[in-house]
């Protein structure tokens, strides 16, 4: 059996552009792609924290260090500039691989620069 686990996440990034007439995708600062291990043209899930929208598209590389987080094409209809989003990618793996797998979690500041990284999420307490 194979499991689908969170491979990488960019947490609470700010949408910088919404380009309806650009070829569909999400353009992500190249430094964030490198930090997460998300590959160009890889499928990603977008969860808009601001409005609750959830959809998928594919990642393309934006200029390194630019802070760009641009939703393009049809995806642009689901967000507005200034919205907070989570970008997530998943990977399929065996149960044995899953036992030792750790996701790349990247947390950003208001300018979409990396504030810190982690490989686990703290346990939620009551």
UniProtKB/Swiss-Prot annotation:
The modification Pyruvic acid (Ser) is found at residue 25. Pathway: Cofactor biosynthesis; (R)-pantothenate biosynthesis; beta-alanine from L-aspartate: step 1/1. It is found in: Cytoplasm. The keyword Lyase applies. Its main location: cytoplasm. The keyword Lyase applies. Its EC number is 4.1.1.11. GO terms for molecular function: aspartate 1-decarboxylase activity. The active site is at 25 (schiff-base intermediate with substrate), 58 (proton donor). Its cofactor is pyruvate. Substrate binds at residues 57, 73-75. Is synthesized initially as an inactive proenzyme, which is activated by self-cleavage at a specific serine bond to produce a beta-subunit with a hydroxyl group at its C-terminus and an alpha-subunit with a pyruvoyl group at its N-terminus. CDD domains: Asp_decarbox. Keywords: Autocatalytic cleavage, Cytoplasm, Decarboxylase, Lyase, Pantothenate biosynthesis, Pyruvate, Schiff base, Zymogen. One of its GO terms (biological process) is alanine biosynthetic process. It catalyses: L-aspartate + H(+) = beta-alanine + CO2. It is an enzyme of class 4 (lyase). Catalyzes the pyruvoyl-dependent decarboxylation of aspartate to produce beta-alanine. NCBIfam families: panD. Heterooctamer of four alpha and four beta subunits. Belongs to the PanD family. This is Aspartate 1-decarboxylase. The gene is panD.
